[in-house]
From Swiss-Prot:
Record protein name field: Adenosylhomocysteinase
Catalytic reactions of this protein: S-adenosyl-L-homocysteine + H2O = L-homocysteine + adenosine
Chain sites annotated for binding NAD(+): 162-164, 196, 225-230, 248, 283, 304-306, 352
Record family assignment: Belongs to the adenosylhomocysteinase family.
Any one of the GO CC terms: cytosol
InterPro entries: Adenosylhomocyst_ase-like_sf, Adenosylhomocysteinase-like, Ado_hCys_hydrolase_NAD-bd, NAD(P)-bd_dom_sf, S-Ado-L-homoCys_hydrolase_CS
CDD domains documented for this protein: SAHH
Length: 436
């Protein structure tokens, strides 16, 4: 047996259990800002729709995720958890969950080896394996398919949180390698158009400012990618007064960016002039070593896509003559042989979680309410192999659960108006193919 599997079945591994009370107080605060999850607890109180579910979870171990985990357990599930990023864990959140009796394996600053060890620990429920997977980014899903394929026969479904993981699911499906039905939570409107857009609009600038104390007003910023995450990122910087330039491969997204007032160029057109570079593409090698060498002295480089492949960090770290100096955790200055330096945040990983605390609780309530509904749906109903999205009526339900807290009063159709539009009186109000 490997050193990893010899240690399987541990109850938890966190950085500092003494932080549990701090974490618990922040969880209580977050619950007030997460009306969707709290409403599901009330709706299913006593019904336990996840009784018997053994959920292996891999998702950023934050305060907001703690509220998700405790919602799953209140609905009857048994849960084991790891983070999906080596820097994203909030140690007080992990401590609070461990203290509450949920097996959690996560701490900020894991090594790559520790990261995969933590993921493996989510798979051992005594003498049983998981029968559900809740994933963010696809690492847990891929790990089970590659390392523990025997567990797949017991797994009823996978719910995937983010764009990168969804791409991976569709790739597996296309190649005939996906063995379990999955829900694409990311493409729920109340996830992608809220978490990806409005969440990034607040959390990107938060991460950059906490890391560097830089004033964004007047700076020239380059945002690579103008999908939902890129749209939120560009708005985040613009709202603080930065002049934002966008790169895109997609003519539709490029046209959207231009009509929002952003200049759309190629990286090589502008890299020498920008003060801040943010990657938000979900792709590889967006910022190359050559780009980094061409950047202004003191420029800031960061990523808000799921993985660290968007910036060529391995080439930067191995380049002869380049020196690295840690300014503080997750803030590193790289100096080139010509004397110029750049500041790289979170080692090229998610800057909003590596250098700050991620998205606000309210918008994560939208995302995580989708996750809970997907888990209930997959656990209680048998799906054929495929990748599915939540039906429109559940998407609208997620939105509705968050309106009262914002003081929203919905207009109600009468029957004549509903008939005229050709929609049910109480929704869904849009066809499945409607683009918000």
């Amino acid at each position: 047996m490997s050193a990893t599997t010899q240690e399987k079945g541990l109850n938890y591994k966190v950085k500092d259990l003494s932080q549990a009370e701090w974490g618990r107080q922040e969880i209580i605060l977050a619950e007030k800002e997460m009306p969707g999850l709290m409403a599901l607890r009330q709706e299913y109180k006593g019904k336990k729709p996840l009784a018997g579910a053994r959920i292996a979870g891999s998702l950023h171990m934050t305060i907001q995720t703690a509220v998700l985990i405790e919602t799953l357990t209140e609905l009857g599930a048994e849960v084991r958890w790891s983070s999906c990023n080596i820097f994203s864990t909030q140690d007080h959140a992990a401590a609070a969950i461990a203290k509450a009796g949920v097996p959690v394996f996560a701490w900020k600053g894991e090594t790559e080896e520790e990261y995969w060890w933590c993921i493996e620990q989510t798979l051992f429920f005594g003498d049983k394996g998981p029968n559900m997977i809740l994933d963010d980014g696809g690492d847990l899903t891929a790990y089970v398919h590659e390392k523990y394929p025997k567990l797949l026969s017991e797994i009823r479904g996978i719910s995937e949180e983010t764009t990168t993981g969804v791409k991976s699911l569709y790739k597996l499906l296309k190649k005939g390698e996906l063995k379990v039905p999955a829900f694409n939570v990311n493409d729920s409107v109340t996830k992608s158009k809220f978490d990806n857009l409005y969440g990034c609009r607040e959390s990107l600038a938060d991460g950059i400012k906490r890391a560097t104390d830089v004033m964004l007003a007047g700076k020239v910023a380059l945002v690579c990618g103008f999908g939902d995450v890129g749209k939120g990122s560009a708005a985040s910087l613009r709202n603080f007064g930065a002049r934002v330039i966008v790169t895109e491969i997609d003519p539709i997204c490029a046209l959207q960016a231009s009509m929002e007032g952003y200049q759309v160029l190629r990286v090589e057109d502008i890299i020498e002039q920008v003060d801040i570079v943010v990657t938000a593409t979900g792709n590889d090698d967006i910022i190359t070593l050559e780009h980094m060498k061409a950047m202004k002295d003191g420029a800031i480089l960061c990523n808000i896509g799921h993985f660290d492949t968007e910036i060529q960090m391995s080439r930067l770290n191995s380049e002869k003559g380049v020196t690295k100096k840690e300014i503080k955790p997750q803030v590193d200055k790289y100096t080139f042989p010509d004397g110029k330096s750049i500041v790289v945040l979170a080692e090229g990983r998610l800057v909003n979680l590596g250098c700050a605390t991620g998205h606000p609780s309210f918008v994560m309530s939208c995302s995580f309410t989708n996750q809970v509904l997907a888990q209930i749906e997959l656990y209680n109903n048998k799906y054929e192999l495929g990748v599915y999205t939540l039906p429109k009526h559940l998407d609208e339900k997620v939105a509705a659960l968050h309106l009262e807290q914002l003081g929203v009063r919905l207009t109600k159709l009468n029957q004549k108006q509903a008939d005229y539009l050709g929609v049910p009186l109480n929704g869904p109000f849009k066809p499945e193919n409607y683009r918000y």
